[in-house]
């Protein structure tokens, strides 16, 4: 007996990492075999050289692209519906119709350019350019464009009959790791509440990790997205469902983020630090896709959906307190993480190293300027019951290592007031 529970290793999507890797985009689209391309992004990024570069590369390869720039921070179901309409317009100009998305073509000789499960011969491919908002919205759009589902019916538990359109993810932040997951988070503005969209077949066909595209990020965005990635890695490592493969990836991601986030915040042109952060964020995404997340994300998503707080900001506010809450059941793992965080002492006890890990996370948060509290967003004790209700209904709690009662969540929130 190995002493290790069985688990599945499914390393997807195919990822291209390195400065200049965006040049591979036309070849990746060609491998998918799409007849039209829609770039999914946000309004701010649409006017930058990043999107201009993407569209120019595609145009030079005789792959003219339509740009949909209607994604908002914390994207909504309205964004998804508008994006699906833009895709329908793009498809109308292609030789195929949207129903052809159900076709599963024979793998091409160039198949290694994309993940083996990626649909080929689809009429439209989506290129999601941006942070987690653009990539998450693209997953909803990829489904809604070929299925009659809108609004809350986009929930990941809903049945879809036609496979999602293929997505190529081009992250421009080192944060959410959304490019490594088949699922995303969008807000239903009618509630308002965030929920999960996606399906097994909405995993990006490929992702392009070009650190040059992250150089223009301002310090506050670099800090917030970096803390998002750190939360992903830590919650993966502390998950109720760990495995040795994900453990190794998560610990290395923690190590890379702790070592490079301050440098990237201090000097946004530091390409070495940017490269380490972008790869680490992707690794954290791979790890969490195999283990799930936890309480920090459950609470953070309520804050994002109801108060429009950016994910990295919400998570960084909560992370040290959630780590302390998990300490009784994850002492050894936090002790192990202390060494990845640069705070471990080989002569210290597990208890002391675990505490040092939490202190190191809090210190890193302060160092990169993430000092906000939930009270700064107008959240009061009167809101705690709603946040608690949202958090306890979040699917990620299936992976949290220590079950939380309503009183536990209220206490965590009270510490932020």
Tell what function each PLM region has.
Residues 380-417:
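Short, amphipathic C-terminal "tail helix"
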Residues 240-249, 264-276, 291-296, 347, ...:
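Flexible, glycine/charged-enriched surface loops at secondary-structure junctions
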Residues 306-383:
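Gly/Pro-rich interdomain helix-loop hinge
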């Amino acid at each position: 007996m190995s002493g290790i529970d069985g688990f599945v290793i499914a390393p997807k999507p195919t990822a291209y990492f390195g400065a200049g890797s965006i040049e591979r985009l036309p070849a990746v689209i060609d491998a998918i075999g799409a007849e039209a391309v829609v770039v999914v992004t946000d309004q701010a990024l649409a006017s930058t050289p990043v999107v201009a570069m993407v569209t120019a590369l595609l145009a030079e390869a005789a792959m003219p692209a339509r740009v949909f720039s209607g994604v908002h921070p914390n994207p909504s179901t309205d964004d998804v519906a508008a994006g699906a309409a833009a895709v329908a317009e793009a498809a109308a100009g292609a030789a195929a119709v949207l129903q052809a998305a159900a076709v599963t073509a024979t793998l091409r000789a160039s198949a290694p350019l994309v993940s083996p499960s990626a649909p080929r011969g689809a009429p439209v491919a989506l290129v999601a350019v941006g942070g987690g908002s653009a990539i998450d919205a693209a997953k909803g759009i990829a489904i809604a464009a070929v299925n009659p589902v809108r609004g809350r019916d986009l929930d990941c538990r809903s049945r879809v009959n036609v496979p999602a359109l293929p997505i190529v993810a081009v992250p421009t932040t080192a944060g959410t790791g959304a490019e490594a997951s088949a699922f995303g988070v969008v807000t239903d503005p009618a509630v308002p509440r965030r929920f999960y969209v996606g399906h097994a077949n909405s995993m990006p066909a490929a992702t392009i990790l070009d650190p040059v595209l992250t150089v223009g990020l301002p310090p506050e965005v670099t800090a917030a997205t970096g803390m998002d990635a750190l939360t992903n890695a830590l919650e993966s490592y502390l998950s109720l469902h760990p495995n040795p493969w994900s453990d190794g990836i998560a610990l290395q991601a923690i190590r890379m983020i702790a070592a490079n986030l301050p440098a990237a915040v201090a000097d946004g042109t530091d390409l070495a630090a940017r490269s380490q952060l972008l790869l680490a964020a992707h690794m954290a995404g791979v790890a969490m896709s195999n283990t799930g997340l936890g309480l920090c994300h459950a609470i953070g998503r309520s804050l994002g959906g109801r108060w429009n707080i950016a994910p990295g900001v919400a998570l960084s506010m909560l992370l040290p307190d959630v780590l302390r809450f998990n300490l009784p059941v994850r002492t050894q793992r936090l002790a192990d993480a202390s060494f990845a965080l640069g705070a471990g002492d080989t002569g210290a006890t597990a208890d002391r190293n675990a505490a040092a890990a939490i202190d190191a996370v809090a210190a890193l948060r302060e160092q990169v300027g993430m000092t906000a509290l939930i009270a700064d967003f107008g959240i009061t004790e009167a809101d705690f019951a709603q946040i608690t209700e949202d958090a306890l209904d979040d699917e990620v709690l299936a992976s949290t290592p220590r079950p939380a009662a309503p009183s536990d969540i209220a206490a965590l929130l009270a510490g932020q007031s």
